[in-house]
């Protein structure tokens, strides 16, 4: 991941119906941020991040989703995922009072920040109401160059089916590294662990695993727990 000062993540998304036009793709911006929290500042970080997320989702029509999550094995290692309707929506967020308050507190709470620039390939979600059962997954997959297009076709179809057919699948996002198109990032949200396990037994998921088993060179599943997840829901965009 590449160091950067800014701590935001942007995506352009489509309407509730699938949108795959070149216009949408050209406007889309997506970043994934990893943040190191200073020792003893984890609770303060959660409070500031949650306040920023709540205020932004309530006040900004173009802010479509903001997710705060942490590593299970190191709660001082955080991730922030944010989704906006476009560049103008992101600019409005950066100019907002809640974002400025977050940035003002950041130096006393955060000691490391990095960003991965990515290109969104699939963005789909439902309205999320987080509770103690909600889980999320963050996964990185490296695909063999010669299988990139086939992998993309298979995984996008699987994610679309999962959202349509499974009530417990709340959000699925896929993106590729802007500097290495063969590296894929997946962020998924499920209503519960039981819903995730049911998902793994579905024909579309098992078909995806079987069809892509020889297409990849590596997979890293980052152990994460949801801290504060908010979205507007009804997002569907595939490239």
Features from the language model and the residues they span:
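Surface-exposed interaction/gating patches
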Residues: 131-172
